[in-house]
Amino acid sequence: MSNRKFGMEGFGINRQTSYSFERSQAPQRLYVPPSSRGGDNSEDADLDNIDYMENEEAEEDIEEGGSAAASGGEVDEIDPLDAFMEGIHQEMKSAPPPKPKEKLERYKDDDDDPVESYLKAKKDLGLTLAADALNAGYNSDEEVYAAAKAVDAGMLDYDSDDNPIVVDKRKIEPITALDHSSIDYEPINKDFYEELESISGMTEQETTDYRQRLGIRVSGFDVHRPVKTFEDCGFSSQIMSAIKKQAYEKPTAIQCQALPIVLSGRDVIGIAKTGSGKTAAFVLPMIVHIMDQPELQRDEGPIGVICAPTRELAHQIFLEAKKFSKAYGLRVSAVYGGMSKHEQFKELKAGCEIVVATPGRLIDMLKMKALTMMRASYLVLDEADRMFDLGFEPQVRSIVGQIRPDRQTLLFSATMPWKVEKLAREILSDPIRVTVGEVGMANEDITQVVNVIPSDAEKLPWLLEKLPGMIDEGDVLVFASKKATVDEIEAQLTLNSFKVAALHGDKDQASRMETLQKFKSGVHHVLIATDVAARGLDIKSLKTVVNYDIAKDMDMHVHRIGRTGRAGDRDGVAYTLVTQREARFAGELVNSLVAAGQNVPPELTDLAMKDGRFKSKRDGRKGGKKGRGGGGGNKGVRGVDFGLGIGFSSESSRTPSSKAAPSRSGAINSVRTGVMAQFKNSFVAATPSNPQNQAYPNKRPSLMGFVSGGTIGGDMGRTQSQAPPVAPTQNASSHNSSQNHSQSSENRPRERKRRSGWDN
């Protein structure tokens, strides 16, 4: 055994100078090259081929030791392990140090920690989205939707200062519109309506009176008369059975006028109060339209496309469409966010005749090639104003660009801002506008009760006191403006043994659908929700709506209370709690109650008078001031006397200060009446002078002339002699030209295709 010393410089080798050979083979022959030894070494040929000495210095030491042994007869012992380790040590000394990896060096930088940077970016993104939602005026649920859409769509970019900004990719990456001129579409039939004798036999005056009773106003060319029963529409026995199964006794106002127009293949702009039955007005004609088309082949469909702004409304329309489609075995698919894209993809790939979707998810499915619009010919945009308010205009345009130009397009909504009308003109062809009631007006079938309370602290005790009586009448829907308030009300009502459920944006789609299903089935009697449930929620057992918090605007208020009093049910009641600090909303609420013919409590009027704008307008209506807004002639919103409500008397409001007003207003009305009569005669001179005394033939030809949406009544039949004598010379010339036009029109064949008043 050798004595080894280990130092920092490596292995040290100390050996004795002589060695006594007691074995038959010398150990050094394994490590000395054959060239340095004499004799035959064939027995060790396999060992001689192994290069143990890779270091040149080690080889020199061995050669010197070998020669010394040969000459002096004495050989130094070389331990194999020591030699091997010495070679490794020398290699380590001569090898260059390894280069540090760039990635590892970057991770060692404390100022650029990837985890810290990621968390910081996420935090900045959340702050940016919150600021955008605040600036956009979103409510609690819309804020959730906006943030989710931004994150899901990857709508994140950075400015020059590396601040995260939200970029709406809907405007950057729309679906390219199809080149319809290069596609050979199969011709389709859109006109399936034939008037029955009971409808075609109505005179113009009878039609006008009937529309007045329904509160219908129409504008457009060749407007069909409204029907009175579902049988007047000519539906098949299968559809009539489905209608009776749903307990539909008679059509609502919007259905009376819209059904014959849609069945005749015309585009429609339908504006009706919430809960008026708009869904059936476009679903029933859609089924007739689809049944006239050839059956779908593999990888074809849909034929009917319905777009809605929210998941809840899309699901509600989906359920309604399934009820009526079951009679013919038509397949209906619902496509909206919150559900599995994979499952929706498979369902669409299997084929369907009707698809109900939100615009965003439908765009996703189109990009995934889950469906094609080559067979689509019936498009419905429901709650169109809400879609445009939520920024869905690019998606709507993209969807429209995928559907054939000669499609039938229907646009239904409860309100119709000017920007929506402008867009409607671009995507609709020669539409007929049907308005039931005032645009954006609350449903008159709903009894509205307003309670003015000192502060928010009195809301919960009031609800706990009134809720048992409300539940006795039916289910109750409570609206709150914040998610935290919803959770608080749910907890308090649960402690008081009420069967309640909550619905807001923080709950996932599956949970929300389960909550709605339990509420509809009677498991829960009270539903507390934010405005996410305000649109499209149709529950027949719902009798009471409570506005625990006021809505953000009157349009949302109208949609909230419209969840009760559905389809003409006059038993609905809507309660609204208003605090002393909500004077501005109180003024708007007074105007809404007046327009709907509801009672205005004095305490609400007193609160509204604290709002400067409302007070100045009211003073202006009274005519007590000569300045801005004065001389209003005691007229309120939409020309309704201020204070009109239950028990209001117009005579009691007259004051001596307004005696001079009638002469001025009478002159203005005379001029207005003369201009309107002249305008209408230029359009309807082709009709007989006395339509009241003449009955129409059994098979009514399409009406000629434009029906103005400015009036409800039958002013069109008024003769020129009834107009006031404003500018006699001009009126006489206009009257003569109208008569000449009438004579020439009677001899000229009627053309169905004419430019409408909607064309620019």
Swiss-Prot record:
Bias (Polar residues): 14-27, 649-666, 718-732
Single GO MF descriptor: ATP hydrolysis activity
Motif (Q motif): 228-256
Top enzyme category: hydrolase
Start and end residues of each Helicase C-terminal domain: 459-608
Sites where the protein binds ATP: A272, K273, T274, G275, S276, G277, K278, T279
Composition bias type Low complexity, residue spans: 733-745
Catalytic activity: ATP + H2O = ADP + phosphate + H(+)
Keywords in alphabetical order: ATP-binding, Helicase, Hydrolase, Nucleotide-binding, Phosphoprotein, RNA-binding
Extent of Basic residues compositional bias: 615-628, 750-760
EC number, as in UniProt: 3.6.4.13
Keyword Nucleotide-binding: yes
Pfam families documented for this protein: DEAD, Helicase_C
Domain of life of the source: Eukaryota
Biased composition (Basic and acidic residues): 99-109
Compositional bias segments (type: Gly residues): 629-638, 707-716
UniProt domain Helicase ATP-binding: residue ranges: 259-434
Xref: InterPro entries: DEAD/DEAH_box_helicase_dom, Helicase_ATP-bd, Helicase_C-like, P-loop_NTPase, RNA-helicase_DEAD-box_CS, RNA_helicase_DEAD_Q_motif
UniProt region (Disordered), positions on chain: 1-76, 90-113, 604-638, 647-666, 706-760
Acidic residues compositional bias, start-end: 41-64
Domain topic, free-text comment: The Q motif is unique to and characteristic of the DEAD box family of RNA helicases and controls ATP binding and hydrolysis.
Family classification: Belongs to the DEAD box helicase family.
Protein name as it appears in the record: DEAD-box ATP-dependent RNA helicase 24
Organism whose genome encodes this protein: Arabidopsis thaliana (Mouse-ear cress)
